[in-house]
Amino acid sequence: MSIRVQKTFEALFELEEIRGIFRDSLPTGLSAEEEAAFRQRIGNLKAIVADLEAGTGTPKVTKIAGTLDVRSREEQYINIHPIQAAGRLTTEARKAIISYGDGYSTCDACRKPFRLDKISKPGIAEFHADLAKWLNMDHARVVPGARRGFQAVTGTLVNKGDSVIVSALAHYTEFLSVENAGGVIKEVPLNAKNIVTGEATAQKIEEVKTETGKLPVLVMIDHFDYQFANEHEIREIGKVAHQYDIPFLYNGAYTVGVQPVDGKKIGADFVVGSGHKSMASVAPSGVLATTKEWAPKALRTTAIVGDLTKRKFGIKEVELLGCTLMGGTLLSMIASFPAVKERVLHWDEQVKRSNYFIDRLLKISGSRVLSEYPRRHTLTKVDTTGSFDTVAKTHKRRGFYFSDELSSRGIVGEFAGATRTWKLNTYGLSEKQVHYLADAFTEIAEKFELPVTK
């Protein structure tokens, strides 16, 4: 680890030790013993900051709680991990975690009606309203990941034996959410370009109707899938669903938070997004948004009454099991939200950089793109069987040589040892970082005498 990065972490950790002194003290101030400990820690901090400024010193803290490594990949490397890119916390989110990391930190000023989305301090109620408006939906809730959004919708709409339409590239959590509700998965086949079309969706609905004698109860399709990150005919699919009067769930796990999403324009009855995948938030976090039509069902409140105590639980929402994100997860999402709203306006720039890198990769003979091309997303599946894998076949490190070469150039996030088909994501990289990334791949190719087109 770079000594300056190391010392930055040590300074942060030392400040937390100082913070602990205040937490253990009385409201009236520090005792003499605590004051001495405080001054000792301040001295330590000054020494760390001096090392940080000079770029000198040796590592003093290498583990957290004795077992956890200090995670510094975002500070030290260009990270192209396929699912980590858009979940990197903003500076404001990291500050929020420092301040709101305690368990029920959202609940300091919780008052009647005792529900998360009604809390005004901090501004959680306002955030929920802003979130719905931003997605052009009528209501929004935060959930522990997109998967819990799927689960809330399937729990509302799906009964045992009901059919649910999904993509042939659907994520496993979509499958599990249907299974959990007792439903049956019906997959829409892909066309030759690995795209789900509106026409194919209509055909699948007709097949289900013929086979079962009734229509599917839900159409749940990804805008961009997780395997290829291909863009599917989401608006056409929404229109088809409505023609059959079937509710449509728009899976925006790879869009909400990185590109503009207009739920009503898309024709979505439900919009589901991932906070930790695409909204610069701590995991597990996500969003579920819906319309006025479906809110009374999907966001229905409890009606159950205890037989002995006659207890009732007010306006807690059944499918969400009441309050959802009660601490740092939600506050990180709120803190990142201004930056997230701004960055979606620059999606085209991110896609342009993705295409720059892919264009450079394709100049290395034998490299292919398995995703649609030109790219419409920053997540891409590539095939380097004809390029970097030819080296792996005879290299003593096999495919791990490629990881070694990337790591030595400050690049991480590829699937270690993979030199055939693998995925990467350039989201959030600056222009100079994308150029550096492309140059690094070219350098590795040239080092091992792979043909490169200039």
From Swiss-Prot:
Pyridoxal 5'-phosphate binds at residues 146-147, 251, 274-276. It is an enzyme of class 2 (transferase). Pfam families: SepSecS. The modification N6-(pyridoxal phosphate)lysine is found at residue 277. It catalyses: O-phospho-L-seryl-tRNA(Cys) + hydrogen sulfide + H(+) = L-cysteinyl-tRNA(Cys) + phosphate. GO terms for molecular function: Sep-tRNA:Cys-tRNA synthase activity. One of its GO terms (biological process) is translation. Keywords: Protein biosynthesis, Pyridoxal phosphate, Transferase. Its cofactor is pyridoxal 5'-phosphate. Its EC number is 2.5.1.73. Converts O-phospho-L-seryl-tRNA(Cys) (Sep-tRNA(Cys)) to L-cysteinyl-tRNA(Cys) (Cys-tRNA(Cys)). Belongs to the SepCysS family. Homodimer. Interacts with SepRS. This is O-phospho-L-seryl-tRNA:Cys-tRNA synthase 2. It comes from Methanoregula boonei (strain DSM 21154 / JCM 14090 / 6A8).
